[in-house]
UniProtKB/Swiss-Prot annotation:
Keywords: Aminotransferase, Transferase. InterPro entries: GCS_T, GCS_T_bac, GCST_C, GCV_T_N, GcvT/YgfZ/DmdA, GcvT/YgfZ_C, TrmE/GcvT_dom1. Its EC number is 2.1.2.10. Gene3D superfamilies: Aminomethyltransferase beta-barrel domains, Aminomethyltransferase fragment, Probable tRNA modification gtpase trme, domain 1. The glycine cleavage system is composed of four proteins: P, T, L and H. It is an enzyme of class 2 (transferase). GO terms for cellular component: cytosol; glycine cleavage complex. The glycine cleavage system catalyzes the degradation of glycine. The gene is gcvT. PANTHER family: AMINOMETHYLTRANSFERASE, AMINOMETHYLTRANSFERASE, MITOCHONDRIAL. The keyword Transferase applies. It comes from Prochlorococcus marinus (strain NATL1A). This is Aminomethyltransferase. One of its GO terms (biological process) is glycine decarboxylation via glycine cleavage system.
Amino acid sequence: MKLLQTPLYQECKELGGKMVPFANWEMPVSFSGLIEEHNAVRKNVGMFDISHMGVVQLKGKNIKSALQNLVPSDVFRIGPSEACYTVFLKENGGIQDDLIIYDQGVLDTNEESVVLVINAARKESDVEWLSSNLSKKEITISEFMPEGALIAIQGPESISTLEKILEEPLSNLPRFGHRTITSNPNLINSQESIFIARTGYTGEEGFEFLSSPETAKSIWKSLIASGVTPCGLGARDTLRLEASMHLYGNDINLDTTPFEAGLGWLVHLEMPNDFIGRKALEKQAEVGTQKKLVGIQVLDKGIARKGYPVLYNSETVGIVTSGTWSPTLQKPIALAYVPSEIAKVNTQIEVEIRGKKHPAIIVKRPFYRKGF
């Protein structure tokens, strides 16, 4: 099957992006090099083409009431121009996807609207699942800004850099706040708009914005001209792992629940509303989990990768879900599921790397925290 290309594919190629297959897309894994890109985001500012992500709009009546039946988080805690991170669940409590819900309030058409940003690899199944569960509601499901380009700009200098380019005040936009910009010198067409949110996947200050391909290309080039470092999937992965942000398919999947994955804070059992997976999570909240996701530091130079066994008292007890060399901390880090009874900070364990046992220790998550 031919790989899909984002609207910024050519721009990435021209900057030397090394393209690789990812979730049926052809995406840049790196430009100048993973370490340089990683450090640019931690110390200055970098940007990513994330146009492969799924962006879906729900419009109609009583949107949030309908959506509340599908997620374990209280969506009424957010209002217009606010957003929240949450998960879709199966009846057994397993995670179907993680996503961000953006509340757009009531549109000019007198319809309620929310925008969902979902994982690229789960887009098709998520939309089918939404359609099935919302079929009896007066709700339309469509792609938000079809053919649009989505850019993430991340790092301590992201606010000042983006404010200069967009000529728009952004420091007053709260974390997980969002707005639609309809009048801006960067807009190629006066009928267009820029959807911008103070969100990210790096553990740093940052924004993500969606616009038409033409406007996105113009802003992309302006950001490059201002010295912003283009970054690929490689740096995006090391940055998110340092911040202990989950990667669907690695750290969370249909066989893991929010309580097991350290995402219990997303489950609001105190609200009266029923939701898919509630009974399973109520039971797990009562009796506890058999496994938990933990942070691991390998104590030598060995790098734990997805699928590597975790040992305790010389017995295999778990498996690594994500692992890398941390450019910021200068040590090997990983996430892994282990039995709940040993999921305690400072527990001595081992990771088997290419047939050899390496000493490791369970540590606090996130490995890196800055600002938030």
